[in-house]
Amino acid sequence: MTVAEAIREYVDETEGLELYEQEPEKGLGILVKGDNSYMETIMNLTRYFDDHNVDDVNMELEGMYVECQGDDTIVYFPELEAQL
């Protein structure tokens, strides 16, 4: 499983998260809704990678950054392409 596939599966399995791909120039994003913690999301995503033997050998998580949009937060992975 690739890093991008793992992120997509994790988001599909986790309540309060959505994929955010409306700004493809920023890369693949995770929309963390409302009262959910983006830091907790990142920690749980890391645990998900460990549990599913996903290794970031190509450094695709490099440059990850966060933007706030109202009550929501978007975690961007600029090295991963958004799919439109």
Describe the role of every protein-language-model region.
Residues L19-L84:
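Acidic, low-complexity, intrinsically disordered interaction modules
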Residues M1-G29:
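An N-terminal amphipathic alpha-helical segment
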